[in-house]
């Protein structure tokens, strides 16, 4: 395949055009008065959303050099989303501003390597300042504020806070579609663990990149499943009964895994295979916990149950099971409440009788999993399009609330970043030459989120940024009420973790772009050009 190569200024300008195309589509959604973007979906109706990462994921540009830029900034949004689950629009904007500011200086003759040193130092300083400004979040009201700011919906904010209160900040909160138009919270018995699907071919819900199984058969196997003849009879029984299947085993490898993947692709059976978590005795104990929760029998030759002889009586079940890349959540297992309670009592006795701190910690973890329960937020709305939009908002709100509980919050609306930018301007004086320019470049970029929040609200962004810069920590511009005030008291707050990962990911990509001297892309195929030749509009 022939390649096209661009050098120097051309390479960087192409990348910048792509960065701008993507970032400009995303930044209109920023702030309480941000607008929506409509995405054309191959299946189903168009999606109307203001979720930055969803928009970014959908964008691919025709010009290959520009597309490089778009994909680089997309990676900022996706990474920030993976770590913090929110703040993707802020991250995208910071990257765009920093790249534009940096490239302007490179074009004017600045040394990219020195600029980068300045940007890196400024980023470190920014993270220190964020930590210094953080206030801890303790009560439900504050968590509700964080969730409300993230979803722009007070009802959602309160439901998310109630969910977090019920299951704790490390508890599991899942989002499902409701059958009615109401959005409601229910806390169900459930258990989750940190292992995901063995193969991405098991995914059956492409929007969430998860495998979702309703009322599946649950097969728990103590050892590896590696022999197809042993495993086939049981698999055939499941296919006949037309139920989805969840397999949890030490491992599924070779032919059995291939068979499951092929049948999953052909849609013969809805199936997911997951490795059992932990090792040794802990794995054994946790499998027994799962057996009680789902009312299954563990297939284990040690107790005389072999895979090739097992029938449907070994299956357990649950109302719903979702499996993502790195987590499995079992909601409403079929096990009786009495048996689960008896199991808890047994673990409590183990905790009381053990001398080893490690064993005690691990047993407490199991107890927490068995007692934790799972909060299910059922999202309702009048139309399919609205349900999808609201589900994205609820997921963002859960992530924001969890991030806030972990690392605290700062004043929102981009105001904390504007005030940190003032600190950076003073800090720049400690540097010489192009490093100083680098520190200042980040200071300029940090003002952009506040600028666009104000612009989207129909005001002059630069005036708002200048006024905010002069205010004390915690105060700033509230774009919802269009007034200046104490944002923390007004509940306009952002989780530190979200802003932190936005700054880290944006500066990392910007530094890569600034040091780019050439870009290499595949030459577009000729046929494509001819196909359009007959369609000139005069």
UniProtKB/Swiss-Prot annotation:
Q: GO:BP terms for this protein?
A: protein refolding
Q: Where is the signal peptide?
A: none
Q: Name one GO molecular function term.
A: unfolded protein binding
InterPro entries the record matches: Chaperonin_Cpn60_CS, Cpn60/GroEL, Cpn60/GroEL/TCP-1, GroEL-like_apical_dom_sf, GROEL-like_equatorial_sf, TCP-1-like_intermed_sf
Reactions catalysed, as given in the entry: ATP + H2O + a folded polypeptide = ADP + phosphate + an unfolded polypeptide
Supply one GO CC term from the record.
cytoplasm
Which EC number(s) are documented for this chain?
Answer: 5.6.1.7
The EC class name is isomerase
Q: Which Gene3D superfamilies match?
A: GroEL, GroEL-like equatorial domain, TCP-1-like chaperonin intermediate domain
- Subcellular location, in the record's words? Cytoplasm
Keywords, alphabetical? ATP-binding, Chaperone, Cytoplasm, Isomerase, Nucleotide-binding
- Where on this chain does ATP bind? 29-32, 86-90, 413, 478-480, 494
Any coiled-coil regions, as ranges? none
Family listed: Belongs to the chaperonin (HSP60) family.
- What HAMAP family does the record tag this protein with? CH60 (MF_00600)
Subunit info?
Forms a cylinder of 14 subunits composed of two heptameric rings stacked back-to-back. Interacts with the co-chaperonin GroES.
Entry function = Together with its co-chaperonin GroES, plays an essential role in assisting protein folding. The GroEL-GroES system forms a nano-cage that allows encapsulation of the non-native substrate proteins and provides a physical environment optimized to promote and accelerate protein folding.
Q: What is this protein called?
A: Chaperonin GroEL 1
At the highest ranks, the source species' classification is: Bacteria, Bacillati, Actinomycetota, Actinomycetes, Mycobacteriales
| Protein's gene | groEL1
